[in-house]
């Protein structure tokens, strides 16, 4: 969730906030380390309360969210973006809320509690993100915009969409874990 919040701050304060890309990269490295630690512990643990494969799938899915988020921050700099489009800021807010829902759902899975309130909201947010990206890409092609700007922003919008889609994948995995263990 921290990486998503930092991306939201980065887009809200751009270009002055470009330095936040470094903090997002640190979050990405921390996520990778955590995923490696999960794998290490799974290899050392004989019995787990949840299927080992499900734990690994969930850890990987959560790491993907951070990876995609960091990718967006990196490409903002690589593409020399001068100012963010409002639709990118809206997508970042969707990403923040979806990661917040996942953050609230994950602890509930330990006791196999009902997480549907959170996963349904993640699915709703993913649909909202889809609507935002379609409208954003459509607005790029309404004329009068430099073709290089169109190419850059189309790619950035799609990368943001990948991060949001990854939250839905994580929610699906959480739902599967609860169903398996109910």
Language model: regions and residue ranges:
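Cytosolic, long alpha-helical scaffolding segments
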Residues: 1-182
